[in-house]
Regions:
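Duplex nucleic acid-engaging cores and interfaces of nucleic-acid transaction enzymes
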Residues: 5-133
Length: 133
């Protein structure tokens, strides 16, 4: 994979278990984050609306449950999804995210899991994460 490019404005958070979670803040950062990440890292995006690409820097077979929830909360927080409702988040490996020519647009191939999160229940989690960047 490409050598990771570090942008000053790209957001980086730390889950409770110490896993790094990176978040793009705009289309260019989303593209760079996705193409420069290890193919085995995990990628998330809120389904059906504009928002940040979230990459969990973990190559394991499965994401730890709490790290997965942390990344989901960040994906919803950095999207246009209403924070008071249930949100669906797509989860796949970076290798299954195909970059399109239009900035910020991707096509998902391979296995994609759709996860659900209720942001009303995750206020404390979000506060903790926002304090780690």
């Amino acid at each position: 994979y490409k050598e990771k490019i570090s942008y000053i404005f790209m957001l980086e958070y730390t889950s409770l278990d110490g896993t790094i979670i990176q978040v793009g803040q705009n289309a260019k950062e989303n593209d760079e984050l996705t193409v420069s990440s290890s193919p085995q890292y995990w990628w998330m995006h809120v389904a059906g609306c504009s928002g940040a690409h979230v990459v969990v820097c973990h190559e394991g077979e499965q994401l730890p449950k709490e790290t997965k929830k942390d990344a989901m909360v960040l994906a919803v927080h950095h999207s246009q999804a209403p924070a008071t409702k249930m949100s669906c988040v797509d989860l796949t490996r970076v290798e299954h995210v195909m970059w399109m020519r239009q900035a910020g647009k991707v096509k998902l191939t391979g296995e994609v899991m759709e996860l659900t999160i209720f942001m009303r229940r995750e206020k404390e989690r979000l506060e903790r994460l926002l304090n780690t960047k």
